[in-house]
Amino acid sequence: MQFSELVDAVRKNPLDVTITEDWGQGRASFGGLMVALQYEAMRAQVSSERALRSLAVTFVGPAEPGVPVSFEVEVLREGKAVSQVLGRAVQNGQVVTLVQGSFGGARESAVKVDSLPAPDMKAPEQCPLLPYIKGVTPEFMR
């Protein structure tokens, strides 16, 4: 299953997503994947005008590939400038990943820091593929 298909699954129904076994390492799904999918569920609950400002992650237990996961979201506080959001990835009734995020809008400041522009990047379909090497690269690279 492609990463984009998993993201689409979270967008369609975050409470019932099954991560395929090719996204696993041993008995657990890759942690970065769990965070990306939980973030996607959280992002959907916050105004697009509020950018992600911080993200704290706790891996509570392994998320077993092939078993449905529920990416739950609770907006803890929707303030004037910042939204505090808690995400829980739950599997078999147990929390496997906790993610707390702060999303905030732009605001006036006496501090001015010029940011560098984002680099130009090709679309994923235009990038060279990393070859699959059995025992070296993860199964999802196939």
Question: Where would I find each of the regions flagged by the language model?
Answer:
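Terminal targeting signals and extreme-terminal segments of soluble enzymes
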Residues: 1-142
